Amino acid sequence: MKVSVVITLAVLGVMFVWASAAELKERGSDQRDSPAWIKSMERIFQSEERECTKFLGGCSEDSECCPHLGCKDVLYYCAWDGTFGK
């Protein structure tokens, strides 16, 4: 019983690899299209300058955090500084 299960799984694995290789050959390699796709999505990968770091965002000093937030010394994130008002 165990041998038949192992043989069945092996055959299914070989069929999967064979079908994947045939599909890749039919469609062509995705690696040729990758650089164009990355260039079109370039703005996503660029870091944006923001006015201030919002709640739980990373920081190195208090001036980077938005109003009423301060930079915590231990994990360096912006958290509420306990103040209220506009």
UniProtKB/Swiss-Prot annotation:
Subcellular location: Secreted
UniProt GO MF annotations: ion channel inhibitor activity; sodium channel regulator activity; toxin activity
Keywords for this protein: Amidation, Disulfide bond, Ion channel impairing toxin, Knottin, Secreted, Signal, Toxin, Voltage-gated sodium channel impairing toxin
Disulphide-bonded residues: 52-66, 59-71, 65-78
Superkingdom as given in the UniProt entry: Eukaryota
Tissues expressing this chain: Expressed by the venom gland.
A Pfam family the protein falls into: Toxin_12
GO annotation, cellular component aspect: extracellular region
InterPro entries: Huwentoxin-1
Domain statement: The presence of a 'disulfide through disulfide knot' structurally defines this protein as a knottin.
Protein function: Inhibits both peak current and fast inactivation of voltage-gated sodium channels (Nav) channels. Inhibits the inactivation of Nav on DRG neurons (EC(50)=1.77 uM) and peak current of cardiac myocytes (IC(50)=0.90 uM).
Name of protein: Mu-theraphotoxin-Cg2a 3
Source organism of the structure: Chilobrachys guangxiensis
